[in-house]
Curated annotation (Swiss-Prot):
Organism for this UniProt entry: Drosophila melanogaster (Fruit fly)
Description of the deletion phenotype: Viable and fertile with no obvious phenotype. Loss of Cajal bodies (CBs) in the nurse cells, spermatocytes, ejaculatory ducts. Loss of CBs in the adult Malpighian tubule cells. Histone locus bodies (HLBs) in the same cell types are present and not affected. In stage 8-9 oocytes, the single CB present in the germinal vesicle is unaffected.
A GO cellular component entry from the record: spindle
Protein name: Coilin
Family per similarity comment: Belongs to the coilin family.
GO biological process: Cajal body organization; membraneless organelle assembly
Pfam family, one: Coilin_N
Length: 634
């Protein structure tokens, strides 16, 4: 056979790119066993067998020439491992008595719970059997279920007694090595005398493998029929115990296979992350489906970022400059500004529109258009009330310095229908505005509805030779303007909003007046008490005690050292808090001018009282120049 290569399917062992591999076949090889060893060395595998691509099994002892007709190979592992893993079970005991137990019962296993040796056993100190347990079992959990040996010594003893205890598991048999077999052969004549059952014969494949292999492993001596019987019996009696004892073995096998896979990945320089992602994404399927499907890996960049690092998102900001679209000049609405403005405009006035046209009129002389005679005002008190009411009917139109009433404007327009000129009006002069008699002529004597009567209008002259124009206005055609009462409060005579009061009838003589000045009387008694207490006072260096009399000064503004200090205040300590250093003082006397400053130091809840509150709550550091009164003995 010449040198060649062949495709090998390793999907039973790997889920990544190694599941389809190409293997070199050397012509110097004799049988299939050499090819199996070569694949095991390449991929760090153990106990594999080969099949052809059409499903034909290749025995290990078969010649290598059979591969000429094969298109491809597939590697797998037997579930039972009859030829490599197992040793024949221990010989059956011949007696049911406890004292005649065989030596095989003292084999110690590597289990999760310690196995206690039998107390009545004669061979407790047999070190040869205990050292065998150092070799851990390499059998998987699935393989243990399939490779059940014949009935063991312990299982027959328990079934004969009728107890529900579980028989010896397959892990006990799997731990026996070739040394056990040789020792069993030496002790065979002794066991034959005691046992009544027959030994199971070796299989031909197992015997050939023992002769050829340099370091043979355990050999199975049970037939297929006995294996099936023991398997069904073990599944009925104790499946849970079997899974628990074999759990440790399967974990060791899985960890070794993972280490082998990692070393192989490092040698081939394949990233570990890619292999783990692809292996996790794919589901275990049949060999044909697994070979046809492609591995798909999903990646999320957000999941790869550290979770504890904050992410800052920057959004573009649009800055718009402020644009001035329109300028508006607001004029004051306060009546006091209007009066000042009207007083300054003695000789100038603005035109007002009429019928949608602006025209100018230049009268040449001053003339009173219409003046109604009103009864004289006799009472001077009504004069002061008339002054307040005269300014009240100012409306929003007065802002433009037009003071003509609607009735008067209509009368003037009707008088000049033939001409294209109009009259121009202004506010009365400053002298006329301050004259109370002229202002009150526009009001009736008993007018209580705050309605204004027609007012006299004046025409500004531009030429001295202008003819006088008179406009007779009927009282029925004049529309009165109602002034709300609340507008009286907005009108004042000065910039300081001080109302004008007529005090001409007040008697200034102090003899007949009831108003008398009150002399300020200084409280000398409190000063005398404090002066007497200072004679026997000593500086206060620590917290006073309850009942002590103290003299101290306080800041005029609490907490402000630059505000200055008050005069001395005398008081008696009623409570002292040693922890917060706050002293409650009941005042004895203090200067009357600092009574308002003491409100800052009043106790909470007492500052709103109408009584003379004298209890203060003061911190020790707020007592300035504090002194304590020492009682003297006469």
């Amino acid at each position: 056979m010449q040198h060649s290569s062949m495709k090998v399917d390793l999907s039973n062992f790997f889920k990544d790119e190694r599941r389809n591999s190409l293997v070199f076949i050397d012509a110097a090889w004799n049988n299939i066993k050499d090819l199996q060893d070569h694949i095991q060395n390449l991929f760090s595998l153990k106990d594999i067998s080969l099949l052809t691509s059409d499903g034909c099994y290749l025995p290990p002892r078969e010649s290598i020439k059979v591969l000429n007709s094969a298109e491809g190979l597939k590697a797998f592992r037997f579930a039972s491992h009859d030829s490599d893993t197992f040793v024949s079970p221990a010989p059956v005991k011949s007696s049911k008595k406890r004292k005649n137990r065989s030596v095989e019962e003292q084999v110690h296993l590597t289990a999760s719970t310690p196995l206690r040796p039998s107390k009545r056993s004669k061979n407790q100190n047999n070190s040869e059997w205990i050292n065998i347990a150092e070799n851990p079992s390499r059998v998987r959990k699935k393989e243990l279920l399939d490779m059940a040996p014949g009935p063991s010594v312990q299982s027959k003893l328990l079934t004969n007694k009728g107890t529900p205890k579980a028989p010896e598991t397959q892990t006990e048999v799997s731990n026996m090595s070739a040394n056990i077999e040789t020792e069993n052969k030496e002790s065979a004549p002794q066991i034959k005398n005691k046992s009544k059952n027959k030994k199971p014969t070796k299989s031909p494949e197992a015997s050939d493998q023992v002769e050829n292999e340099p370091a043979p492993k355990s050999i199975s001596r049970c037939t297929l029929k006995e294996g099936k019987m023991s398997e069904s019996k073990n599944q009925e009696t104790s499946p849970d115990i079997l899974s628990e004892k074999s759990g440790v073995v399967t974990k060791e096998n899985e960890t070794r296979e993972e280490q082998q896979d990692k070393t192989h990945l490092e040698s081939n320089k394949i990233p570990d992350k890619l292999s783990q992602l692809k292996a996790g994404d794919q589901i275990e399927k049949s060999p044909g489906i697994a070979a046809s499907l492609l591995s798909i890996s999903f990646r999320s960049p957000l999941l790869e970022m550290p979770f504890n690092v904050p992410r800052i998102f920057q959004f573009p900001t649009k800055k718009q400059q402020i644009e001035i679209l329109e300028y508006k000049k607001l004029k004051p609405i306060s009546p006091r500004f209007l009066l000042q403005k009207g007083a300054k405009s003695d000789d100038t006035a603005k035109q007002f529109p009429s019928n949608g046209k602006d025209s100018t009129l230049k009268p040449k002389s001053y003339e009173i258009l219409h003046d109604e005679e009103l009864p004289d005002v006799k009472d001077k008190k009504n004069v002061s009330e008339g002054i307040k009411r005269a300014v009240a009917p100012l409306c929003e139109d007065i802002i433009e310095t037009s003071t003509t009433l609607p009735g008067a404007i209509g009368a003037v327009e009707s008088a000049y229908l033939d001409n294209s000129t109009e009259a121009e009006t202004t506010l009365p002069s400053e002298a006329e505005a301050t004259n109370p008699l002229e202002l009150t002529e526009s009001f009736l004597q008993n007018n209580t509805s705050m309605e204004k009567t027609p007012k006299v209008e004046k025409i500004l002259p531009d030429d001295g030779s202008a003819s006088p124009i008179k406009n007779n206005v009927d009282s029925k055609d004049v529309k009165t303007v109602t002034v709300p009462i609340f507008e009286e409060q907005l009108v004042s005579d000065s910039d300081d909003d001080v109302m004008l009061v007529d005090d001409s009838n007040i008697d200034v003589s102090y003899g007949d007046s009831d108003i008398e000045p009150i002399p300020v009387v200084e409280n000398r008694q409190s000063l005398d008490i404090i002066r007497d207490l200072l004679r026997t006072a000593t500086p206060l260096n620590s917290l006073p005690s309850r009942g002590d009399t103290v003299i101290f000064k306080l800041l005029k503004i609490k907490g402000n050292a630059n505000s200055g200090t008050t005069e001395f205040v005398a008081g008696r300590c009623t409570y002292v808090n040693r922890r917060t250093k706050i002293v409650t003082v009941e005042t004895i006397t203090y200067p009357p001018e600092i009574g308002r400053m003491l409100r800052q130091y009043y106790m909470s809840g007492l500052d709103e009282s109408s009584e003379d509150v004298r209890t203060l709550s003061i911190h020790l550091k707020d007592m300035l120049e504090a002194k304590i009164i020492v009682a003297t003995i006469d």
